[in-house]
């Protein structure tokens, strides 16, 4: 929470919670099909592959950490009524999962009527009937009751539900397709799911395959694959890294590590419908991103405040040794000087150390931006700068991401941001910066009653540190997944008072983290 007095904070409007949740929940598909895209006859599956049934159970039941569901967290399976009825009674509802059945007429009581009477009350806790199609189910799963308690939503059939999944508005929320390909043709099939669909607007990438193997039951050959929609936005980042490493020039730098560098690039990321561009080809430290951005917004300059939260991204630049090397011998250890947050909230004020009270001192650029957006959204001077030439020598590190310009689309009521970053560490810094300015744009949009629009990231000296080359080559081999969603579980009276725990990133399916050393 901000130390500032209330009159110096930015009050949040009554509309602050309007876009706290997405319109529809992201989801995945689990399906098995033969060589003619057949999935069944409407009542049963015309092949026997026990390994696929085991995969289905594990994939839809276990959480992403491969642990079983808990009272607070489980997955959901969405199915049509015929698919529900095709499940043997003894397995209804599917254990350990929230079963969402799409039906215009059935009730929970009717669906559970075939069960022994003594089991119905407990089973009712695991079944929800949605009067509508897949979109209505995803709308329900995007609401507060389920957004945090459901980790992954799986669409499991039948044919009409799969067909709906491949059409708007559902297709925009489809993150993964787990497909078991049966290397045979079942003449009994009367229901089909062509995947990948021909002439589809969405391109699909094969993310993984367990390899073609033979079932121990009937000897059928099968292959379990995972497909993901092509993430063109993350590919911008990967392609830029590849271009830097192939065509950039080798340069020495102040850290002594050395870089491969090129000058001038740009990437664009959509923030619409709660989308958060948190890179997936490696796990990005979201907690660090969020806490640092809130630290900026509060005008704080003590790295110790972050270290106390076990966030050590500024420790190197706040060390006694580093401060002394910058000539900042009078700064207390971990006092970074008038860096980002100070310039955002107190531009031009005389810096007297991180412990001083700066209420009302300098230019509060963030507050000015919020007020101007609300009163004059067409203003072309909606800029925030951290680059103060008069204060650079007092900073532990001059700002790398130094200028943000905001833009209001008055036709769509969307707020977009263009970030200019002079020095761009592609391996460590840039993934952080993308997510950080996405969050800043989302919060400013909340404070001004607008929807988040787009983040445009303009890079000056875009470079790869030489000691990051091998790690980045490994990252380039990975297939990007869909970006996650940011939700707000709690709201605050003032912009500066939002906390990490008020937000949650859901449907984030990244590859493992990749260790890279920070050049100090």
UniProtKB/Swiss-Prot annotation:
<feature type="binding site">
    <location>
        <position position="162"/>
    </location>
    <ligand>
        <name>substrate</name>
    </ligand>
</feature>
<dbReference type="InterPro" id="IPR020940">
    <property type="entry name" value="Thymidylate_synthase_AS"/>
</dbReference>
<keyword id="KW-0545">Nucleotide biosynthesis</keyword>
<feature type="binding site">
    <location>
        <begin position="157"/>
        <end position="164"/>
    </location>
    <ligand>
        <name>NADP(+)</name>
    </ligand>
</feature>
<dbReference type="InterPro" id="IPR023451">
    <property type="entry name" value="Thymidate_synth/dCMP_Mease_dom"/>
</dbReference>
<keyword id="KW-0511">Multifunctional enzyme</keyword>
<feature type="binding site">
    <location>
        <position position="254"/>
    </location>
    <ligand>
        <name>dUMP</name>
    </ligand>
</feature>
<feature type="binding site">
    <location>
        <position position="32"/>
    </location>
    <ligand>
        <name>NADP(+)</name>
    </ligand>
</feature>
<keyword id="KW-0808">Transferase</keyword>
<feature type="binding site">
    <location>
        <position position="180"/>
    </location>
    <ligand>
        <name>substrate</name>
    </ligand>
</feature>
<keyword id="KW-0489">Methyltransferase</keyword>
<feature type="binding site">
    <location>
        <position position="52"/>
    </location>
    <ligand>
        <name>substrate</name>
    </ligand>
</feature>
<feature type="domain" description="DHFR">
    <location>
        <begin position="26"/>
        <end position="229"/>
    </location>
</feature>
<dbReference type="Pfam" id="PF00186">
    <property type="entry name" value="DHFR_1"/>
</dbReference>
<feature type="binding site">
    <location>
        <begin position="81"/>
        <end position="83"/>
    </location>
    <ligand>
        <name>NADP(+)</name>
    </ligand>
</feature>
<keyword id="KW-0560">Oxidoreductase</keyword>
<dbReference type="GO" id="GO:0004146">
    <property type="term" value="F:dihydrofolate reductase activity"/>
</dbReference>
<dbReference type="GO" id="GO:0006730">
    <property type="term" value="P:one-carbon metabolic process"/>
</dbReference>
<comment type="pathway">
    <text>Cofactor biosynthesis; tetrahydrofolate biosynthesis; 5,6,7,8-tetrahydrofolate from 7,8-dihydrofolate: step 1/1.</text>
</comment>
<feature type="binding site">
    <location>
        <position position="433"/>
    </location>
    <ligand>
        <name>dUMP</name>
    </ligand>
</feature>
<feature type="binding site">
    <location>
        <position position="401"/>
    </location>
    <ligand>
        <name>dUMP</name>
    </ligand>
</feature>
<comment type="function">
    <text>Bifunctional enzyme. Involved in de novo dTMP biosynthesis. Key enzyme in folate metabolism. Catalyzes an essential reaction for de novo glycine and purine synthesis, DNA precursor synthesis, and for the conversion of dUMP to dTMP.</text>
</comment>
<dbReference type="GO" id="GO:0032259">
    <property type="term" value="P:methylation"/>
</dbReference>
<dbReference type="InterPro" id="IPR036926">
    <property type="entry name" value="Thymidate_synth/dCMP_Mease_sf"/>
</dbReference>
<dbReference type="InterPro" id="IPR000398">
    <property type="entry name" value="Thymidylate_synthase"/>
</dbReference>
<dbReference type="GO" id="GO:0004799">
    <property type="term" value="F:thymidylate synthase activity"/>
</dbReference>
<dbReference type="GO" id="GO:0005829">
    <property type="term" value="C:cytosol"/>
</dbReference>
<dbReference type="GO" id="GO:0005737">
    <property type="term" value="C:cytoplasm"/>
</dbReference>
<feature type="active site">
    <location>
        <position position="400"/>
    </location>
</feature>
<protein>
    <recommendedName>
        <fullName>Bifunctional dihydrofolate reductase-thymidylate synthase</fullName>
        <ecNumber>1.5.1.3</ecNumber>
        <ecNumber>2.1.1.45</ecNumber>
    </recommendedName>
</protein>
<keyword id="KW-0521">NADP</keyword>
<dbReference type="InterPro" id="IPR001796">
    <property type="entry name" value="DHFR_dom"/>
</dbReference>
<comment type="similarity">
    <text>In the C-terminal section; belongs to the thymidylate synthase family.</text>
</comment>
<feature type="binding site">
    <location>
        <begin position="102"/>
        <end position="105"/>
    </location>
    <ligand>
        <name>NADP(+)</name>
    </ligand>
</feature>
<dbReference type="GO" id="GO:0046654">
    <property type="term" value="P:tetrahydrofolate biosynthetic process"/>
</dbReference>
<dbReference type="Pfam" id="PF00303">
    <property type="entry name" value="Thymidylat_synt"/>
</dbReference>
<keyword id="KW-0554">One-carbon metabolism</keyword>
<feature type="binding site">
    <location>
        <begin position="421"/>
        <end position="425"/>
    </location>
    <ligand>
        <name>dUMP</name>
    </ligand>
</feature>
<dbReference type="GO" id="GO:0005739">
    <property type="term" value="C:mitochondrion"/>
</dbReference>
<dbReference type="InterPro" id="IPR045097">
    <property type="entry name" value="Thymidate_synth/dCMP_Mease"/>
</dbReference>
<comment type="similarity">
    <text>In the N-terminal section; belongs to the dihydrofolate reductase family.</text>
</comment>
<dbReference type="InterPro" id="IPR024072">
    <property type="entry name" value="DHFR-like_dom_sf"/>
</dbReference>
């Amino acid at each position: 929470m901000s130390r500032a007095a209330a009159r110096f904070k930015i009050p949040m409007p009554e509309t602050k919670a309007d876009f706290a949740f997405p319109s529809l929940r992201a989801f995945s598909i689990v399906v098995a099909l033969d060589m003619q895209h057949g999935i069944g006859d409407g009542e049963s599956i015309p092949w026997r592959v026990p390994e696929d049934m085991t995969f289905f159970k594990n994939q839809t039941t276990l959480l992403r950490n491969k642990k079983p569901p808990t009272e607070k967290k489980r997955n959901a399976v969405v199915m049509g009524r015929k698919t529900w009825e095709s499940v043997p009674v003894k397995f209804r509802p599917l254990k350990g999962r929230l079963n969402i059945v799409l039906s215009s007429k059935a009730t929970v009581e009717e669906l559970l009527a075939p069960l022994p009477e003594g089991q119905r009350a407990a089973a009712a806790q695991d079944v929800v009937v949605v009067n509508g199609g897949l979109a209505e189910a995803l709308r329900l799963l995007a609401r507060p009751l389920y957004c945090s308690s459901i980790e992954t939503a799986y669409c499991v059939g039948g044919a009409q539900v799969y067909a709906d999944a491949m059409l708007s508005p559902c297709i925009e929320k489809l993150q993964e397709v787990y497909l078991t390909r049966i290397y045979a043709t079942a003449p009994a099939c009367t229901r089909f799911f062509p995947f990948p669909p021909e002439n589809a607007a969405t391109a699909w990438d094969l993310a993984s395959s367990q390899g073609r193997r033979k079932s121990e039951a009937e000897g059928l050959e099968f292959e379990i694959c995972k497909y993901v929609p092509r993430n063109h936005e993350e590919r911008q980042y990967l392609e830029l890294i590849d271009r830097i490493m192939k065509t950039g020039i080798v340069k020495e730098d102040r850290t002594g590590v050395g870089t491969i560098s090129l000058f001038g690039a740009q990437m664009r990321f959509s923030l619409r419908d709660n989308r958060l561009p948190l890179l997936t080809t490696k796990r990005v430290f979201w907690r660090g991103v969020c806490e640092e951005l809130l630290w900026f917004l509060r005008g704080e300059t003590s790295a110790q405040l972050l270290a106390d939260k076990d966030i050590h991204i500024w420790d190197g630049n706040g060390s006694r040794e580093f401060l002394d090397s910058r000539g900042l011998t009078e700064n207390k250890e971990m006092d970074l000087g008038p860096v980002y947050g100070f310039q955002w909230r107190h531009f031009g004020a005389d810096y007297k150390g991180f412990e001083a009270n700066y209420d009302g001192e300098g230019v509060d650029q963030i507050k000015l931006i919020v007020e101007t957006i609300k009163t004059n959204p067409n203003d072309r001077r909606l800029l925030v700068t951290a680059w103060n030439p008069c204060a650079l020598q007092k900073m532990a590190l001059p700002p790398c991401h130094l200028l943000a310009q905001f833009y209001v689309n008055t036709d769509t009521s969307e707020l977009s941001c263009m970030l200019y970053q002079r020095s761009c560490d592609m391996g460590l810094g840039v993934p952080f910066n993308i997510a950080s300015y996405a969050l800043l744009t989302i919060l400013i949009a909340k404070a001004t009653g607008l929807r988040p629009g787009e983040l445009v990231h303009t890079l000056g000296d875009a470079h790869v540190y030489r000691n990051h080359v091998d790690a980045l080559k490994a990252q380039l081999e990975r297939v990007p997944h869909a970006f996650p969603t940011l939700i707000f579980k709690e709201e605050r009276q003032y912009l500066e008072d939002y906390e990490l725990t008020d937000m949650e990133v859901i449907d984030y399916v990244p590859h493992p983290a990749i260790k890279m050393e920070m050049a100090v």
